[in-house]
Amino acid sequence: MTQYIQGQWLAGEGHEINSKNPANGDVIWQGNTATATQVNAAVDAARAAQFDWFMLGYEARLAIVEAYRAQLEANKAEIAETIAQETGKPQWETATEVGAMIGKIALSAKAHDKRTGTETNDLPAGRAVLRHKPHGVVAVFGPYNFPGHLPNGHIVPALLAGNTVVFKPSELTPKVAELMLKCWDKAGLPQGVVNLVQGEVETGKALASHPQIDGLFFTGSSRTGHILHEQYAGLPGKILALEMGGNNPLIVKGVTDTKAAVHDIIQSAYISSGQRCTCARRLYIEEGAQGDALIAELVKAIKQIKVGAWNVQPQPFMGSMISETAARGMVAAQATLQSLGGVSLVELVQVEAGTGLVTPGLIDVTKVAELPDEEYFGPLLQLVRYSDFDQAIHLANATRYGLSAGLLADSREDYDYFLARIRAGIVNWNKQITGASGAAPFGGVGASGNHRASAFYAADYCAYPVASMEADAVSLPATLSPGLSI
């Protein structure tokens, strides 16, 4: 029973799919995809449930969402282990993901009140009231890299606002999605409020093109996001929120503590095996002896990074990539950069055939004349040496993306200069660029999104404002307009 529609667990009526542990190829979930007919049923269920869910009132909706939080807390060990099994991430990291899922509840409630609450202003003969109403039925498309946390960041604020949801997770992480829906079910969510459709591209197409959805919230690749954007062109009545990737730059300038700089570079480039949308893809280090010393220390540290399966002890820093296909893609990306003149300082290598395990790579692309503006979604960091700060910033901005960027520098003046000129939605100073606060918005510019920041600002795309002029009774004004006699 792989689909959750109208509060019932149903078997998919499409073809068989499975998910595998990318570290060893073991099958950990099997099921069948949702057909277009089942997608229709899920949307119909969400539509039928939506008005009653909205009319239940915010406090009652919040109580159910809080009950879901309690279910996450009660099942956090199982959820963390399942995320680790399906994604290949080490358990220390998946435990933090479940913690973020739990923490999202309070943050979403706070954001709902602050961003989309009700506000009343008195007028001489009445009042002006601002309220917010839900869009209706929204589709949520989840990614594989944070299969719990990222869709959770769309679903929770959508429900608080009064929307109902049809959730289509990544086909690579169906078991995590199944656990999430079991938690919602145990929380007492009314039938039809959240529906789960598992499947691959055809299931996604059926949902994205469904005429009865009022919006779509997507986290994933820029390529897929652009397809969705084209599909929704000419449909201004539907809300589309796109959270996509980036070719993210990290500049190092005048850092005294080189060990700390190395740590932040590694955390920026290689955490989650480089499979975070905010991961550093390009590293800019000054020419000269200080830069040489930093690179030597970085190379040494990269070679010491422990890579292993999600459950090995002691725990590795890097687990598996999501699949063998993804691992091979990174080997191919490295070969492409080498063919263009890049020189590998640390070779990225597939550890074991048939798995997604790879070692981290560092490649010097300073002499590559035309560096591809691609998001290589894995643990491959491109190094560029620069001669002056303006050149580094210019090169950092030479991308169609604009998600995250960072500066490691001792000088506040340098950071202010950088902050004013860099083009990105997340800009960090002396922090890893994979670090972001749930109490702040999360999103980028350019090919990284469509100006619908998520996290604390997710509330904004989950509801629309309703402005009202109100009075308790119909009454004549003290003075009639010229030319009127009543």
From Swiss-Prot:
Superkingdom, natural source: Bacteria
EC id: 1.2.1.71
One Gene Ontology term from the biological process aspect of the record: arginine catabolic process to succinate
Matches recorded under Gene3D superfamilies: Aldehyde Dehydrogenase, Chain A, domain 1, Aldehyde Dehydrogenase, Chain A, domain 2
Record carries keyword Plastid: no
Binding-site list for NAD(+): G220, S221, S222, R223, T224, G225
Active site: E243, C277
Keywords on record: Arginine metabolism, NAD, Oxidoreductase
Pathway annotation: Amino-acid degradation; L-arginine degradation via AST pathway; L-glutamate and succinate from L-arginine: step 4/5
Catalytic activity entry: N-succinyl-L-glutamate 5-semialdehyde + NAD(+) + H2O = N-succinyl-L-glutamate + NADH + 2 H(+)
InterPro entries: Ald_DH/histidinol_DH, Ald_DH_C, Ald_DH_CS_CYS, Ald_DH_CS_GLU, Ald_DH_N, Aldehyde_DH_dom, SuccinylGlu_semiald_DH_AstD
Keyword Cytoplasm among UniProt keywords: no
Any one GO MF annotation of this record: succinylglutamate-semialdehyde dehydrogenase activity
Its job: Catalyzes the NAD-dependent reduction of succinylglutamate semialdehyde into succinylglutamate.
Family membership: Belongs to the aldehyde dehydrogenase family. AstD subfamily.
HAMAP family found in the cross-reference section: Aldedh_AstD (MF_01174)
Protein name: N-succinylglutamate 5-semialdehyde dehydrogenase
Species assigned in the record: Shewanella frigidimarina (strain NCIMB 400)
Lineage: Bacteria, Pseudomonadati, Pseudomonadota, Gammaproteobacteria, Alteromonadales
Recorded name of the encoding gene: astD
